[in-house]
Design a protein with these regions (language model features):
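Acidic-basic catalytic patches of nuclease active cores, encompassing PD-(D/E)XK
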Residues: 1-25, 39, 131
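Charged phosphate-binding loop/patch that engages nucleotide di/tri-phosphates or the phosphate backbone
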Residues: 108-131
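Mg2+/Mn2+-dependent nuclease catalytic core
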Residues: 51-70
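Acidic, Ser/Thr-rich peripheral helices and adjacent loops at domain boundaries
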Residues: 97-106
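Extended, alpha-helix-rich binding/interface surfaces that flank or overlap catalytic cores
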Residues: 88-90, 106, 110
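Nucleic-acid nuclease catalytic cores
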Residues: 67-98
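Beta-rich catalytic cores
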Residues: 30
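Conserved catalytic cores of phosphodiester-cleaving nucleases, focusing on short active-site segments
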Residues: 34-36, 41-52
Length: 131
């Protein structure tokens, strides 16, 4: 099982107020990994990333998706310690910030962060709708 699949399972297990649909799409490159639906009936997308350093890797298609769809899109990053699987933290960014995230990596201040999915839920789920 890949690291992003493990991240999805942790997120799904600990965010029971959100209905998740995993989007495994090979025909539309760049489509985010998850479609979420919260208690308020709002839909949003989430791109999942797992990294062991400050840099976060995105494909050109993923960047293009978030540039084209900046509202109600998010990027959730699980940061692990270098050369280990020890969790450092979870970082949540709005999709509209993808260009900054590409250049600055995890040095960019997140919109929300925590040490587990439930702490993120208290801080950020659901994020306030963007204007």
């Amino acid at each position: 099982m890949g690291p992003e699949r493990k991240l999805y399972l942790k997120l799904k297990k600990n965010t029971d107020r959100i209905k998740w649909t995993r989007l495994e799409n090979i025909s539309l490159l760049g489509t985010p990994d998850l479609l979420g639906n919260n208690d308020s009936g709002n839909f949003f997308t989430v791109e999942l990333k797992v990294t062991k350093g400050k840099k976060v890797k995105f494909s050109p298609h993923q960047i293009a998706f978030h540039v084209e769809h900046p509202h109600n899109s998010h990027i959730l990053i699980e940061a692990l310690g270098p050369r280990s699987s020890k969790l450092i933290g979870w970082y949540l960014y709005r999709g509209s910030r993808i260009k900054e995230l590409v250049t600055q990596g995890l040095r960019l201040e997140p919109d929300a962060w925590g040490s587990d999915p439930s702490s993120l839920m208290l801080v950020a789920w659901p994020l306030e709708p963007e204007a």
